[in-house]
Structures are given as C-alpha cells and as structure tokens.
Amino acid sequence: MPASRSLGMSSDARVNNESGFILHTYPFKETSVVAEVFTRAHGRVALIARGARRPASALRGLMQPFSPLLLSWFGKADLKTLHAAEWQGGLVAPQGRALMCGFYLNELLLRLLARGDAHERLYDRYVETLDQLARSAAASDAERATAFERILRRFEKNLLSEIGYGATFDVEAGGAAIEPGAAYVFQPERGALRAAGQPGCPVSGQTLLDLAGDSFERLATLGEAKALMRALINHTLGTKPLYTRQLLRELTELNP
C-alpha cells in the first residue's frame, strides 16, 4: 500500500495512486532504476525507483511495461521519487509481434510527449490500443498483420493530433475540398496539394478522406496512410530514427 504522507511534505509535491504504465527503465546507481512512466493525470513522468534492482525489492517485478499500475511518488524536481507501486490488472499482456508494436507505441510516447503534460484522452487511447493489439494476436496471420496496421495508424493519428501536430485531411492546403479520385502530395507544413510535380508524400484523395473519417478498411488506404504517418512523425521527431520501427521492418522482412 502507498506510504503515508511525510510530515512537512506539501500536498503539491506528492501524488498518490495515479494510474500509469512503465514506458522504459534504465539503471540508476547501484541498486535503483529510473522509470519513465505515462500516467493519466500527469502525463509522462520520470521516477527514481530506489532499490528496485535488489532481489528482495517489492518494486522489482513491477518495473515492466504494459502492466497497469497505481503509482505514488513525491518530489518537485524533474526527476521524482517513486514510493509505492501496485499492479491493477485487467489488461492482457501483448505477446510476439503485438509486443513489438507495444514497444513502438512506448517509443513514440517517449520521443513525442513532454514531461508533465497531461493527455487523458491519449492515455485512454493507449490502454485501448494495448488491449486491441493483445486481442488481435489470436487472429490468422493475414488478419493479424492487417489488424496491427489499422491499430497503429489510428494511434499515430491520435497521438499527432493530441500533441498539436494534427493535420487536416479533408481540405486542400488552398481550402478546396479533397476529391476522392484526385492525386495529391502531402507536405507536413502545408497539407494536401495537387500532385502536379510538387514534392511531398504521394497520397490519393480517397485515402485522405478515409483518414479524415478515421476509416482504415481499404488496403490501399492502409498502405498510403502508413507512408503518410511516417512522414508526419519523422517531421515531428527530427533526424533521429525510431529504433522499434526498424525492428518491425526487419521482422516483416523475415516473416513476409
């Protein structure tokens, strides 16, 4: 159970029983770890889990991704101190390729979310996405691959929108309505332009309208949406590539 409030600790320095997930951990000093967590009410937070690497530590088995936790911490600095963690349960852990997709989500959140910014709707979408990935793992090979693509594209689109990089997909950069039969290119800083020798990510009008309507049923839409989301995410991230994206690409090449 979470420890009681320490005397002299101001209320704004302590958070108790906050829902969250471990995104990533790394060693800190001899026996501790730093856990980057994604929480519903406080966004991304960095926590020191003191002694978590000791064999007898109650925290040791909880410092794993994709497990719903209740987290309690204190501190006003950017790096806070975890003082309690409790497993909530209720979520099936992803396995196999679904697990790699989950690590991809975590890397996106680590790279794109600023610490301390709450994103409650995105948190709920993250929980829903993990559940969808785990449940889709039981489908046939062909159905599973397509399901994973749909799930990832929806999350990418929601993530970009949540952090302020959401694009308009149903209107051209000049204000005209997107035509389903027309060919376009999409530029991250301008939007959709008629594909008349313009640089950008090639995309059909129908795919843009499908994106605007959050519809990923067409296989052609899935393929073009993947390239477009990659272009938008790369534009937001800068030059450093996503490690898990490369791993997913290599897995696809090994298991076509």
Curated annotation (Swiss-Prot):
Q: Which UniProt keywords apply?
A: DNA damage, DNA recombination, DNA repair
* InterPro entries reported for this sequence: ARFGAP/RecO, DNA_rep/recomb_RecO_N, NA-bd_OB-fold, RecO, RecO_C
Which top-level group of life is the source organism from?
A: Bacteria
Transmembrane segments annotated in the record for this chain: none
Annotated GO biological processes are:
DNA recombination; double-strand break repair
A single Gene Ontology CC term: bacterial nucleoid
Enumerate the NCBIfam families for this protein: reco (TIGR00613)
The family this protein is said to belong to: Belongs to the RecO family.
PANTHER family membership: DNA REPAIR PROTEIN RECO
Q: What does this protein do?
A: Involved in DNA repair and RecF pathway recombination.
Write down what this protein is called: DNA repair protein RecO
Gene name per UniProt: recO
